[in-house]
C-alpha cells in the first residue's frame, strides 16, 4: 500500500522575472516559489516528504493540451530581446515572457507529470508540485494570466492516456477562474472540473460569461463543469466549507474519481491583493483533508496563484501538513455562509440538479436559480458604500493581519488499539496495542464505578473502562496519541465512562457519532455533547444538540449515508467544534450495509478536534475492527464506487432535519433565507 507524500521543487523555476514595467504583471515574482519552499523547509515539512526530481515535459506531452503553432511560437522566446519579448507578450492577456520562461514552463509541466507518475505508480500516496509559471489560465493556443502551459490540463490528459483513467476530478481553489482547464475539458465527461473564483457578476478578471454558474459543460460533458462564482470579496472559512459540503463533496463522491488533481492557488487566502478574501491559511488544511479519502488517496496538488508571500507560505504548509496526515487545526467561529455565497451555492445546486443525483430533489424544493442579483442592500458587496477618506481609510488586503497558524505536531503514536482479550491483530505502521493500565487509571475507574455504577462487578467491563480512560488520557492530556480504538462489550457503560472522564477536564465539547439502533445514555441539553445517531429505526428529535438519521436499508443506503454525512453531519460537527470525537458502532450495525461507509466517515471526522477520535466497537467483528484501525491510522480507504440515487423518503427525512436545525447550526444552510 502506498504511503508518504512527494514534494517536487526546483529553484530553476524561479529564474525568470518581469523585465519591464507592467502593473498587471508585477505581482508575479520569483519569490512566490522560493518562499513556498522555504516555508516547508523551515517547518520541517520538506524533509518529511519524498523528494522527486524535476524533468522537462516533452513536446509531445505539451501538445496534449496545446497547438503546434502555439508551442512553436513560445519556443522562439529564448532568442528574443526585451523589446521583442514585450511585443510577444502583448499578443496575450496579462502575461509576460522572459528568455528563460520557456525552459521554466517545460519544467513546471514536467514536474506536474512527475507527481502524477509517483502517485499513479503508488510510489507515494499523494504529493505537491511547487511550480512556476502557473498553468490554469493557459489555453490551447494562448498564454494567459501569467500561465504559459496548462500544467494541470496536461497532467489530466497524460494520466488518461498513460494510466487508462476514466474519471479524474480537478478541484481549482484559486481565486481566479481557470478558464483554460474549463475550455480543455468542457466536452469531456471523464474529467469533472470544479472551480470557485472571484467573479462579482463578471466584473472581475477574466470577466467571462462562461465563468458563471450556468456554464455546466457541453455535449457529453454537460454536468461535468461546475463553476461557483464568488460575487463579493471577503469570503470566509464558513463560505469555503459550505461550498465543499453542499456542492463539491456530494458530486465528487457520486463521480467516484480515480485521481484527484488540485489547482492550488492560494490567492483565495486572507491578505492576498488579488482575492481580497478572508479565509485563513488553516482552511486549506481542511479542504485538503476533506478530499483525501477520494480516489483511494491518490491526490496531486499543483501550485497555481498566491501573491501575499506570508499567507502563501502559510497556506502551502497547511496543505502539506494534511497531505502528510498531521492533525488538522481546530477552526472556531464557523457559522452561516454569507447571503452572496449562499446565493451562488443555491444557483449551482439548482443548475446541476439535471445531472447529479445528489441535487435531483431540488427541482421542486428550492427556489428558481434566476434570483435577483444581490446588491449592497440585500447582502451584496458593501465596500463601495463607504468611500475611503482620511478619517476612514479603506483597508487594502496587505493591511489585514491574522494570527500565525499554530504548530501542527504529529503525535508520536497515531493509533492505540485495544482488541478483545486473546485476539491477535497485525497493526499498521505507527499504531500500537495499549499497554497495562496504570495505577492512576485504576483509581479513576474505581472513582467512576463508585459514583455511577455501584453494582458493576464484571471484570471484563471494568478492564474495558480502564482501557478507555488510559487511551483518553494519552490522547487528551499528554498528546502522546492521536486516536484510539477500543472493543467493548457493554456499550452503555463504556459511553458513559468515556464522556464522564473526557468532560471532567480536557474536553469542553464532545461530538458523539453513533451508528446503531437503540438509545445511548447521552445528555445533550447542556451543550457540551452533540449526539449524531445513524440508525434504521425511527426516532424523534427535539433537542438542537441531537441529530438522528433513520436511513432505509437497500441499494441506496450507502448514498443516503454519504449524503447525510456530507450535507448534515459534517456541517454541524465543524460548527460545534468539538475537542473530542467519540465514534461508536453498535453490535447489530456491523451486520448492515452501513459499514461500507464507516471507513470514509472515520477518515473525514478526523478533521475535527485535531484528530482526537476515540472509537468504541461493541463486540468483535474482525473486518470492522481492521477497517476502523486502517481508517484511524491514515491509510487509504477503498473507494465506494458510483453512488445510486437517494430514496425519496431519505431525502425528505434529511431536509426535515436540515430545516429543524439550521436556525441553530448555520453551516447547514445551502439556500438564501427568504425572510
UniProtKB/Swiss-Prot annotation:
Chain residues that bind substrate: 22, 94, 307
Location within or outside the cell: Cytoplasm; Nucleus
Gene3D superfamilies: Histone deacetylase domain
Stated consequence of mutating residue 94 to A: No effect on steady-state kinetic parameters
Family matches, as CDD domains: HDAC10
Reactions accelerated catalytically: N(8)-acetylspermidine + H2O = spermidine + acetate; N-acetylputrescine + H2O = putrescine + acetate; N-acetylcadaverine + H2O = cadaverine + acetate
Enzyme class per UniProt: hydrolase
Pfam families in the cross-refs: Hist_deacetyl
Highest taxon listed in the record's lineage: Eukaryota
Region (Disordered): 362-399
Function: Polyamine deacetylase (PDAC), which acts preferentially on N(8)-acetylspermidine, and also on acetylcadaverine and acetylputrescine. Exhibits attenuated catalytic activity toward N(1),N(8)-diacetylspermidine and very low activity, if any, toward N(1)-acetylspermidine. Has a very weak lysine deacetylase, if any.
Identification of the protein by name: Polyamine deacetylase HDAC10
Organism: Danio rerio
Amino acid at each position: 500500500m502506498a504511503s508518504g507524500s512527494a514534494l517536487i521543487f526546483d529553484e530553476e523555476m524561479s529564474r525568470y522575472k518581469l523585465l519591464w514595467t507592467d502593473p498587471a504583471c508585477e505581482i508575479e515574482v520569483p519569490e512566490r516559489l522560493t518562499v513556498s519552499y522555504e516555508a516547508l523547509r523551515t517547518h520541517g515539512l520538506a524533509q518529511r516528504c519524498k523528494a522527486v526530481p524535476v524533468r522537462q515535459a516533452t513536446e509531445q506531452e505539451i501538445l496534449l493540451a496545446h497547438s503546434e503553432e502555439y508551442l512553436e511560437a513560445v519556443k522562439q522566446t529564448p532568442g528574443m530581446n526585451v523589446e521583442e519579448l514585450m511585443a510577444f507578450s502583448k499578443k496575450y492577456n496579462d502575461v509576460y515572457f522572459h528568455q528563460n520562461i520557456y525552459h521554466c514552463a517545460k519544467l513546471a509541466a514536467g514536474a506536474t507529470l512527475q507527481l502524477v507518475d509517483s502517485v499513479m505508480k503508488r510510489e507515494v500516496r499523494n504529493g505537491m508540485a511547487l511550480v512556476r509559471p502557473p498553468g490554469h489560465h493557459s489555453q490551447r493556443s494562448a498564454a494567459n494570466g501569467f500561465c504559459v502551459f496548462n500544467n494541470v490540463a496536461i497532467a489530466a490528459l497524460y494520466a488518461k492516456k498513460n494510466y487508462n483513467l476514466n474519471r479524474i476530478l480537478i478541484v481549482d481553489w484559486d481565486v481566479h477562474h481557470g478558464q483554460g482547464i474549463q475550455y480543455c475539458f468542457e466536452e469531456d465527461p471523464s474529467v469533472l472540473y470544479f472551480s470557485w473564483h472571484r467573479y462579482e457578476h463578471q466584473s472581475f478578471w477574466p470577466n467571462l460569461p462562461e465563468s458563471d454558474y450556468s456554464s455546466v459543460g457541453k455535449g457529453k460533458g454537460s454536468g461535468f463543469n461546475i463553476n461557483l462564482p464568488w460575487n463579493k470579496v471577503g469570503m470566509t472559512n464558513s463560505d469555503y466549507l459550505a461550498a465543499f459540503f453542499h456542492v463539491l463533496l456530494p458530486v465528487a463522491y457520486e463521480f467516484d474519481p480515480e485521481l484527484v488533481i488540485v489547482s492550488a492557488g492560494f490567492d483565495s487566502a486572507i491578505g492576498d491583493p488579488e482575492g481580497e478574501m478572508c479565509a485563513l491559511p488553516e482552511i486549506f488544511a481542511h479542504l485538503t483533508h476533506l478530499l483525501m479519502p477520494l480516489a483511494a488517496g491518490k491526490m496531486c496538488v499543483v501550485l497555481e496563484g498566491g501573491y501575499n508571500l506570508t499567507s502563501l507560505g502559510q497556506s502551502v504548509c497547511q496543505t502539506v501538513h494534511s497531505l502528510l496526515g498531521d492533525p488538522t487545526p481546530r477552526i472556531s467561529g464557523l457559522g452561516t455562509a454569507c447571503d452572496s455565497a449562499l446565493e451562488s451555492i443555491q444557483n449551482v445546486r439548482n443548475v446541476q440538479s439535471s445531472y447529479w443525483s445528489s441535487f435531483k430533489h431540488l427541482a421542486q424544493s428550492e427556489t428558481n436559480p434566476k434570483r435577483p442579483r444581490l446588491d449592497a442592500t440585500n447582502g451584496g458587496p458593501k465596500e463601495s458604500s463607504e468611500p475611503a477618506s482620511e478619517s476612514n481609510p479603506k483597508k487594502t488586503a496587505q493591511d489585514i493581519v491574522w494570527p500565525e497558524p499554530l504548530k501542527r505536531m504529529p503525535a508520536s503514536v497515531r493509533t492505540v488499539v485495544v482488541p478483545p482479550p486473546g485476539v491477535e491483530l497485525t497493526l499498521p505502521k505507527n499504531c500500537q496495542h495499549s499497554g497495562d493500565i496504570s495505577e492512576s487509571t485504576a483509581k479513576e475507574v474505581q472513582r467512576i464505578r463508585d459514583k455511577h455504577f455501584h453494582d458493576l462487578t464484571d471484570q471484563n467491563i471494568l478492564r474495558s473502562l480502564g482501557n478507555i480512560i488510559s487511551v483518553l488520557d494519552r490522547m487528551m492530556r499528554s498528546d502522546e496519541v492521536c486516536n484510539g480504538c477500543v472493543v467493548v462489550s457493554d456499550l452503555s457503560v463504556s459511553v458513559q465512562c468515556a464522556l464522564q472522564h473526557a468532560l471532567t477536564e480536557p474536553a469542553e465539547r464532545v461530538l458523539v457519532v453513533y451508528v446503531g439502533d437503540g438509545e445511548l445514555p447521552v445528555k445533550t441539553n447542556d451543550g457540551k455533547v452533540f449526539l449524531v445517531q445513524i440508525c434504521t429505526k425511527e426516532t424523534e428529535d427535539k433537542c438542537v444538540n441531537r441529530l438522528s438519521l433513520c436511513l432505509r436499508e437497500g441499494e441506496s443506503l450507502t448514498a443516503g449515508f454519504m449524503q447525510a454525512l456530507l450535507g448534515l453531519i459534517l456541517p454541524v460537527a465543524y460548527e460545534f467544534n468539538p475537542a473530542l470525537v467519540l465514534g461508536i458502532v453498535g453490535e447489530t450495525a456491523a451486520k448492515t450495509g452501513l459499514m461500507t461507509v464507516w471507513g470514509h466517515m472515520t477518515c473525514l471526522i478526523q478533521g475535527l478536534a485535531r484528530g482526537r477520535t476515540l472509537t468504541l466497537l461493541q463486540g468483535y467483528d474482525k473486518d470492522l475492527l481492521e477497517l476502523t484501525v486502517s481508517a484511524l491510522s491514515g491509510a487509504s480507504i477503498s473507494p465506494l464506487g458510483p453512488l445510486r440515487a437517494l430514496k425519496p423518503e431519505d431525502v425528505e427525512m434529511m431536509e426535515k432535519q436540515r430545516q429543524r436545525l439550521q436556525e441553530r447550526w448555520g453551516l447547514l444552510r445551502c439556500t438564501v433565507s427568504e425572510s
